Amino acid sequence: MTPGMGLREDGMRKVWMLTASCLMAAAFVGPSVAQNAEAEAAAARASAAAAQARANATTSDSDPLEKICRIGPHSRETEIQKIAPFKVFDNLYHVGPCYVTSWILTTPQGHIMFDTSQEPFVGLIEDNIKKMNINPRDIKYIIINHGHTDHFGGAKRLQEFTGARVVATPQDWKMIAETEGKPNNRDNGKPTDVPKHDMDLNEGDHLDLGDQHLIIHTAPGHTPGNLFIEGIVLHDGAQTYKGIWGGGGGGAPGLAGAEQGVKNAEKVNAVKGVQVYIQTHAWQDPNGYPGGGVHERAKKLATRKPGDPHPFVDANTWNDRAKAAQANALKAVEKEKQKATSGK
C-alpha cells in the first residue's frame, strides 16, 4: 500500500458516505419553508462533513491537501474543491479552488487577477473575492496563463463580474476560441463559455499598473502561447520580494518541440533573483510535497509568528524548477535524436 493511501481512502469514504446520507435525507424534503430550511441545513452539514473529511485525509505528510484535490474525480467535486481564501502578502491573495490557483495582485490604482479556474468553481471565486474585501470592479486585468479550460474557463463570467480586460497570448486566444461550446468535463459536460478577446500579450511586452511593472515571457510547449511573468513586487510589511508567476519549462512533442523546450528553459534560467514562485496549480512537481505545495505553505503561514520567515519566500523552489526544466529539456532533445537515428 502506498504510504498514506489508507488514510486518504478512509477520509474520502467519509466524504461520499456523509454526502450520500444528506442527499437521501433531502429526497424527502417538501416545499414548505421549514422543509426548505432543513434542506439548506442538510446541504450545509454535507459541506461541513466534506471539509472535515478532507481535513482528516490530509493529516499525513504523504497526502497533503494539494494531492487530495488533484486525484481523479476529486478535481471535479465542488465540496472537495471549496477552500477559504487567504492573504499571502500585503498585496497578494489566493481566491481559487483547491486544485488550480487563482490569485489577485493588488495596487492602489487597481488589481490584476491571474487565472480564473473554470465552472463549477467560479461562484466560489466570486465569493472568495468578496470575503477578502476586494471590490471586484477594482480588478483591471485578468491574465490567462495558457489556453486550457482549467485556467481560462471562468474568464467570461469573471469578465462580466469585474469589468476587467482579459489578457492572453495571441496563440492561446486562438486555442480559447476553438474551445467555445465544447463539453466541460468538470461541469457535467456543459458547454464551455469563452471570454471576449480583449487584449494580447507577446514576448517582451510590459504591463504596468500602480507599482507593478510586469514583464511578459512566452514559453511555447505546454500550449503554443504558454507564458510566465516576472517583475512582480510583493510586500510583507517593510519587506519587498521579487515574485514570478507561471510555468515556462517543457516543449511540445517531437525534436522541434524538444529544442523549443531548451530555449524555454534558457529563458526561465535567465530570470535571476526570484524569491517567490506564484504557482499556477496548488501542487508543483518536481518539488513534491509539502515543500512545493501552496496549501502546505498556507498552513504554515496561518501559524506564522512575528519574526518567523515567510513560508512562501523560498528562492530554492524556483531555482530547482528552473534547473530541472533545463535538464529535462536536454534529455528530451537527446531522446528525440535517438528516436530519429533508430527510426522508431
Region locations from a protein language model:
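Bacterial N-terminal signal peptides
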Residues: 19-27
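Sec/Tat signal peptide C-region and signal peptidase I cleavage site
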Residues: 29-34
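Zn-dependent metallo-beta-lactamase
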Residues: 35-110, 344
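C-terminal regulatory/interaction regions
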Residues: 36-54, 315-344
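Metallo-beta-lactamase
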Residues: 68-72, 81, 87-89, 111, 118-120, 138, 197-198, 206-209, ...
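Conserved beta-strand hairpin/beta-sheet module of binuclear metal-dependent hydrolase folds
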Residues: 77-132, 136, 228-249
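Active-site HxH/HxHxD metal-binding segment of metal-dependent hydrolases
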Residues: 92, 120-123, 129-206, 296-307, ...
